[in-house]
Amino acid sequence: MKRRATFQCPLIESTIKHQSTNYTKTETATTSHEVSENANEHKGKSNIDINKIAYYNVVWRKITMKKHKTWEGDGFLVREDSNLTLYNSDFTRLGSCHSRVPQIKEGELLRISGKEISIEKEISAESYEAGTHIDDSLRDVHMPEMKRKFKPPLRPNTMYQTISALPKPRHDPTVLGALVMSRPKTWDPRTHVDVVIDPFLSKHLYSHQREGVSFLYDCLLGMEGKCGYSAILADEMGLGKTLQTITVVWTLLKQSYYANRSSTINNAMVVAPVTLLKNWENEFYNWLGHERIHVYIARCAEDFQEFTSNKTYSIIITGYETVCTYLRNYGCGIDIDLLICDEAHRLKSMSSQTWITLNKLKTRKRLLLTGTPLQNDLSEYFSMVNFIIPGSLGTPNSFKAQYERPILRSRSMNASSRDISLGAARLQRLFEFTSNFTLRRKANILAKHLPPRTDIVLFIKPTHQQENVYGHVLDGFKSSVDQKGYYLKILTRLSKICNSTILLRNEKENFLSTELQDKHVFEQENMLLSSSKLQILAALLKSFQRGCQKAVIVSQYKETLELIELFLSILHVRFCKLLGSTPFSERDLIVHNFNTSSFKEFSVLLLSSKAGGCGLNLTGSTRLIIYEPSWNPAQDLQALSRIYRSGQKRPVCIYTFLSSGMLDERIFIRQNTKQGLSSSFIDSDASQKKNFFTGEDIKTLFSYSKTETCLTYELAFDSDEIDSLTKKKDPLTKIDHTIDSPNTKEKDKEISSWKKASEYMDTNLGKKCPENAFQGWTWQFPNDLSIMNGVEDYIPLEPLPINCLMHKKFE
């Protein structure tokens, strides 16, 4: 009986080697029987060894009386003690039963829960946990090998032949420093030539960028070992994704490994946020020049028609909303050979209109660029992979069953040893497969190419006014907790208080004292009383002025930026701003003026993290202030990469303002633990693990912890150690926190609910606390700010409302 052909997902089901088996003869020789009947047959035998777990590859079907039977699908049979469990190929449980069968043989037919199964072979536990039917590596499903060599229709001696020299490549591959691309498997020197990156581009590439260009070329051309004709370049911000992309595009436009072809593609489309359209155009002309390439920016439907009719242009740059509107109104008539999506985390949901509309393009070669490929969960990454290589990870449900759920279960505080090993195996399997088309490098490789960067986190002591208003809001929350949408409303108010109590001036509830509701509220003295952050900001701007250091101030709230704008005007600081309300036509000019102007012309740029946090080049600045942390750590990572990137020539300092003990700091702690899954999967860093939070975590958000230091430090050290460190007579206490703190004392004492909620599982080290997230940071308690070892160039030498700070240097 022949087995019906089914689609074999290259990751979940791999390749099944079929053997020519006469199933009709097997059914005649081996009568199908119930497992329970076998149990009766072998009952009473004392030498049966069933105390082990065994795994089998099977095919299954529902029990039917049809004459010509077909198998419905593949699956697994797990025998544990006397229990047999049947799973589908996507690990959906199909049924189970109790059995005393001593041995299961290949080709044997069994019946379990109304299903008839045929045993194919026994597999190892490693193969089962990895989620593959066989141990063979994945084969390229897109490039089948030629079965027969091409034969010309005429005999060689009857064809007119001329003796000619072998074809030559566009650039010499033997020159020192030449970057030569991979050759195809069917290489023939008579019909193929080497593809060599143009020297005027390759001479500017760093080593990691040369590797990236080679990787992207192999993926986009479907070279041996690559899956599909697409790729994801997921380098962290600042590593030069734009330059690598331009190099690959230019190479494909001007070269082909076929000697009789002048190019691999005829055109390419770059889809990016509207704030980056002009930046992409400038980058193309900056690296290639106006004489080599012609770029067209499409802002309406007529621009797309102009691009298709005018062969002068080979690159079209457009925004996500623009191209989606065009495709919805005019269909998918535009022919694009290469689709490039910048800031591709916009495609993190398969149900979004952007994903659905762009996926209608009949473009096989697709390149996604993103510095944050995994912001929240694995389903976002699955969505991006499914956009470039449909079906490579199976269906959404099968992906969740086979990978996402086991991986997340393995990071639960209650995970068993089996859950941990299964999750690790699935994670490794997923990483190995996706590494065929995903390239991810971390920003630390920039250290040898860029000047040093210093990160400073300031744990700021709130003013008395902030503490009073904060407590008043929390008291009101406890009495109105059942109101719909009240949680989000309170969180927004608490976040505003961390920045300044003035931001609540227009609230209906009377949170503020009467003296701060009159017309004098915006005087400098009253503004400083409303926020310790403004006090720190004033001191920093004064120190920046001495060294002529330009600064970028980043906030996610428009009201906060407007308040800072007013404060800068009072201090007579010249500034420019880029907010969500800034017209797109003016944004490029603002960035250009800020980068090229002198310190006296513009010393500060106010930047909205949501409007301008992606892709902007602000290397004219050397100081960046993150005024409040974002729930999404990717936003802050995007922001700091605006000034610390290729092209930066001077040392950089990143400041993060946190109101100690308030919502600010709790978000910051959540940030550093939230990146565990991204680090462990995308970066393949086994030391970083996902943190799981319980309901206790949510409760602690609506509280204020007044401490002498900060919550972050208390998570890393026990109270006895804190007292011994903070009560020393030294005016400054410095701690190099580069190793794990001992947990022996914590076992005998009760720890806080927040710390319990912050614990997670590490495969190698067991239960860990968030101190691992802050390894390598140096802690300081500035009772006297006249001495600041390591950060004296970045912190003003005057008394400031700072409980403590931690800093880290990247060089």
Swiss-Prot record:
Belongs to the SNF2/RAD54 helicase family. CDD domains: DEXHc_RAD54, SF2_C_SNF. It comes from the Eukaryota. PANTHER family: DNA EXCISION REPAIR PROTEIN ERCC-6-RELATED, SNF2/RAD54 FAMILY MEMBER. Residues 20-42 are annotated as: Disordered. It catalyses: ATP + H2O = ADP + phosphate + H(+). ATP binds at residues 235-242. GO terms for cellular component: cytosol; nucleus. One of its GO terms (biological process) is reciprocal meiotic recombination. It comes from Schizosaccharomyces pombe (strain 972 / ATCC 24843). Its main location: cytoplasm. This is Meiotic recombination protein rdh54. PROSITE patterns: HELICASE_ATP_BIND_1, HELICASE_CTER. Signal peptide: none annotated. The keyword Endoplasmic reticulum does not apply. Interacts with dmc1 and rhp51. Residues 20-33 have a biased composition (Polar residues). Residues 540-693 form the Helicase C-terminal domain. Keywords: ATP-binding, Cytoplasm, DNA damage, DNA recombination, DNA repair, DNA-binding, Helicase, Hydrolase, Meiosis, Nucleotide-binding, Nucleus. It is found in: Cytoplasm; Nucleus. The keyword DNA repair applies.
